[in-house]
């Protein structure tokens, strides 16, 4: 997309602004229905981006801490319904219904805590997916502007927000109906189904219980609880640079 604008700045000067979007925005124009069975989120990312004509390593990159945590129906060694052996994992269905490629991939990434950004090197806008701070690379230093025509920061603002600080995940797996979640301190049962809890360091009132996030094991529920807590932390304390 290209947004153009012309503004009269006075004193015989005009300001012409052009806003460019990366190639990833073109995926808004591809709207389909699709079903994935037993595929992990990283595998779906690679499949969709390759179908859009993007090449891994050149046009996009996955900087994930451990792709194994996104494996489909990753078991946690728990037996189901008194069984002597762990329950066999059931393939997960991931459905794209009347969604553009970009909306579909963005939704999947947001659910499991994968963010994406763009690097502009070697004349290419590379799309980078990451789930860890080191995936963003070393931060660049910019000085406050000391005069006209110099590159730097003009305005620095910091904003605090009150957010919930305790996050629960609750789900039910009919293949392992005996699973339950207990408080690690008191030992009392919190949910008689799959569950998990994550907290922020900040001590603020408020809690969120998310039901049916499609977690099939306690390990998966714990990962999602941590993701929801990290999302809230990202909104709690923000810096704005201009």
Model regions: which residues?
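Amphipathic alpha-helical and helix-coil boundary elements used as assembly
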Residues: 1-242
